[in-house]
Protein backbone atom coordinates (compact mmCIF):
# COMPACT_ATOMS: atom_id res chain seq x y z
CA UNK A 1 0.00 0.00 0.00
CA UNK A 2 1.33 3.43 -0.92
CA UNK A 3 1.36 6.23 1.62
CA UNK A 4 1.04 9.71 0.21
CA UNK A 5 1.86 13.21 1.38
CA UNK A 6 1.24 16.69 0.07
CA UNK A 7 3.46 18.76 -2.19
CA UNK A 8 3.85 22.35 -0.98
CA UNK A 9 4.60 25.51 -2.97
CA UNK A 10 4.54 29.22 -2.23
CA UNK A 11 2.04 30.87 -4.57
CA UNK A 12 4.52 33.53 -5.67
CA UNK A 13 7.14 30.92 -6.62
CA UNK A 14 4.92 29.52 -9.37
CA UNK A 15 5.14 30.80 -12.94
CA UNK A 16 2.11 30.66 -15.21
CA UNK A 17 2.21 30.63 -18.99
CA UNK A 18 -0.80 31.34 -21.18
CA UNK A 19 -0.56 30.57 -24.89
CA UNK A 20 2.65 32.05 -26.34
CA UNK A 21 3.12 34.71 -23.68
CA UNK A 22 6.09 34.88 -21.36
CA UNK A 23 5.65 33.17 -17.97
CA UNK A 24 3.94 35.41 -15.40
CA UNK A 25 3.87 35.42 -11.63
CA UNK A 26 0.60 35.15 -9.74
CA UNK A 27 0.78 38.86 -8.93
CA UNK A 28 1.16 39.78 -12.63
CA UNK A 29 -1.81 37.59 -13.53
CA UNK A 30 -3.94 39.18 -10.82
CA UNK A 31 -3.01 42.68 -12.09
CA UNK A 32 -4.45 41.67 -15.48
CA UNK A 33 -7.78 40.90 -13.78
CA UNK A 34 -7.44 37.13 -14.03
CA UNK A 35 -8.52 34.99 -11.07
CA UNK A 36 -7.14 31.53 -10.35
CA UNK A 37 -8.93 29.11 -8.07
CA UNK A 38 -7.89 25.74 -6.68
CA UNK A 39 -10.78 23.45 -5.80
CA UNK A 40 -13.27 26.32 -5.92
CA UNK A 41 -11.32 28.70 -3.66
CA UNK A 42 -8.96 31.56 -4.46
CA UNK A 43 -5.38 30.35 -4.73
CA UNK A 44 -3.92 30.59 -1.20
CA UNK A 45 -0.49 32.06 -0.39
CA UNK A 46 0.82 28.56 0.30
CA UNK A 47 -0.46 25.75 -1.89
CA UNK A 48 -0.41 22.18 -0.60
CA UNK A 49 -1.43 19.68 -3.23
CA UNK A 50 -2.82 16.71 -1.36
CA UNK A 51 -3.13 13.38 -3.14
CA UNK A 52 -6.22 13.00 -5.22
CA UNK A 53 -8.09 14.93 -7.87
CA UNK A 54 -7.98 18.73 -7.90
CA UNK A 55 -9.49 21.40 -10.11
CA UNK A 56 -7.76 24.57 -11.28
CA UNK A 57 -10.11 27.25 -12.55
CA UNK A 58 -8.91 30.34 -14.41
CA UNK A 59 -11.42 33.16 -14.70
CA UNK A 60 -10.83 36.10 -17.03
CA UNK A 61 -13.98 38.19 -17.34
CA UNK A 62 -16.68 35.89 -18.71
CA UNK A 63 -14.15 33.31 -19.88
CA UNK A 64 -13.71 30.32 -17.57
CA UNK A 65 -11.15 27.56 -18.09
CA UNK A 66 -11.13 24.48 -15.88
CA UNK A 67 -8.39 21.85 -15.67
CA UNK A 68 -8.54 18.72 -13.54
CA UNK A 69 -5.23 17.43 -12.18
CA UNK A 70 -4.26 14.30 -10.29
CA UNK A 71 -1.63 14.46 -7.54
CA UNK A 72 0.29 11.60 -5.98
CA UNK A 73 3.39 11.71 -3.81
CA UNK A 74 5.29 8.62 -2.72
CA UNK A 75 7.23 7.78 0.43
CA UNK A 76 10.43 7.91 -1.63
CA UNK A 77 9.53 11.42 -2.82
CA UNK A 78 9.06 12.52 0.79
CA UNK A 79 12.45 11.04 1.72
CA UNK A 80 14.26 12.64 -1.21
CA UNK A 81 12.66 16.05 -0.55
CA UNK A 82 12.92 15.59 3.23
CA UNK A 83 9.37 16.85 3.52
CA UNK A 84 6.61 14.76 5.10
CA UNK A 85 3.84 17.31 4.59
CA UNK A 86 0.47 15.60 4.39
CA UNK A 87 1.38 12.47 6.32
CA UNK A 88 -0.40 11.66 9.57
CA UNK A 89 1.09 13.09 12.75
CA UNK A 90 2.47 9.66 13.65
CA UNK A 91 3.91 9.12 10.16
CA UNK A 92 5.45 12.59 10.10
CA UNK A 93 7.14 11.88 13.44
CA UNK A 94 8.86 8.83 11.92
CA UNK A 95 10.01 10.82 8.87
CA UNK A 96 11.23 13.64 11.09
CA UNK A 97 13.17 11.16 13.26
CA UNK A 98 14.86 9.77 10.12
CA UNK A 99 15.62 13.28 8.82
CA UNK A 100 17.07 14.29 12.21
CA UNK A 101 19.24 11.15 12.36
CA UNK A 102 20.57 11.91 8.86
CA UNK A 103 21.33 15.53 9.80
CA UNK A 104 23.23 14.34 12.89
CA UNK A 105 25.19 11.53 11.22
CA UNK A 106 25.74 12.36 7.55
CA UNK A 107 28.14 15.11 6.54
CA UNK A 108 28.56 16.82 3.21
CA UNK A 109 31.36 15.25 1.22
CA UNK A 110 30.92 11.75 2.65
CA UNK A 111 31.33 8.92 0.16
CA UNK A 112 28.52 6.41 -0.36
CA UNK A 113 30.47 3.87 1.69
CA UNK A 114 30.92 6.35 4.55
CA UNK A 115 27.19 7.15 4.51
CA UNK A 116 26.25 3.46 4.63
CA UNK A 117 28.62 2.89 7.57
CA UNK A 118 27.36 5.98 9.42
CA UNK A 119 23.72 4.89 9.03
CA UNK A 120 24.57 1.33 10.07
CA UNK A 121 26.48 2.51 13.14
CA UNK A 122 23.73 4.93 14.15
CA UNK A 123 21.05 2.24 14.01
CA UNK A 124 23.15 -0.43 15.72
CA UNK A 125 24.35 1.82 18.55
CA UNK A 126 21.16 3.79 19.16
CA UNK A 127 18.58 0.97 19.25
CA UNK A 128 18.13 -2.57 20.57
CA UNK A 129 16.22 -5.62 19.43
CA UNK A 130 12.76 -5.47 20.98
CA UNK A 131 12.24 -7.58 24.11
CA UNK A 132 15.75 -9.00 23.75
CA UNK A 133 14.71 -10.77 20.56
CA UNK A 134 11.36 -12.09 21.82
CA UNK A 135 9.36 -11.00 18.77
CA UNK A 136 6.14 -12.76 19.78
CA UNK A 137 5.45 -10.15 22.45
CA UNK A 138 6.51 -7.17 20.29
CA UNK A 139 4.16 -4.21 19.83
CA UNK A 140 3.06 -3.28 16.29
CA UNK A 141 5.33 -0.22 16.26
CA UNK A 142 8.37 -2.52 16.62
CA UNK A 143 7.87 -3.66 13.01
CA UNK A 144 8.06 -0.20 11.41
CA UNK A 145 10.87 2.35 11.18
CA UNK A 146 9.46 4.13 14.23
CA UNK A 147 10.54 1.17 16.32
CA UNK A 148 14.25 1.91 16.08
CA UNK A 149 13.99 5.61 15.19
CA UNK A 150 11.55 6.70 17.91
CA UNK A 151 11.16 3.91 20.47
CA UNK A 152 14.82 2.87 20.12
CA UNK A 153 13.97 -0.81 19.75
CA UNK A 154 12.53 -2.96 17.01
CA UNK A 155 12.65 -6.20 15.05
CA UNK A 156 14.83 -6.78 11.94
CA UNK A 157 12.17 -5.23 9.71
CA UNK A 158 12.29 -2.02 11.75
CA UNK A 159 16.04 -1.76 11.24
CA UNK A 160 15.69 -2.45 7.50
CA UNK A 161 12.99 0.17 6.94
CA UNK A 162 14.83 2.76 9.04
CA UNK A 163 18.02 2.07 7.08
CA UNK A 164 16.16 2.54 3.79
CA UNK A 165 14.61 5.82 4.97
CA UNK A 166 17.93 7.22 6.14
CA UNK A 167 19.77 6.02 3.03
CA UNK A 168 17.34 7.69 0.62
CA UNK A 169 17.19 10.86 2.74
CA UNK A 170 21.00 11.04 2.67
CA UNK A 171 21.07 10.84 -1.12
CA UNK A 172 21.91 7.17 -1.62
CA UNK A 173 20.20 5.47 -4.56
CA UNK A 174 18.07 2.66 -3.19
Regions found by a protein language model. Name each.
Residues 1-35:
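Solvent-exposed, low-complexity, repeat-rich "mucin-like" stalks and linkers
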Residues 2, 42-45, 114-118:
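Short glycine-rich, low-complexity/disordered patches
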Residues 2, 73-89:
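Low-complexity, Pro/Ser/Thr- and charge-rich linker/hinge segments at domain boundaries
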Amino acid sequence: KNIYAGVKYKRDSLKWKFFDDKPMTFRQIKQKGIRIELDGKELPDEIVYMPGEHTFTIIAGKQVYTKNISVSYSVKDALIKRDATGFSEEGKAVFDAAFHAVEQNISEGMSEEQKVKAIHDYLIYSANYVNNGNYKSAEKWAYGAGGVLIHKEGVCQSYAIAFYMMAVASGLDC
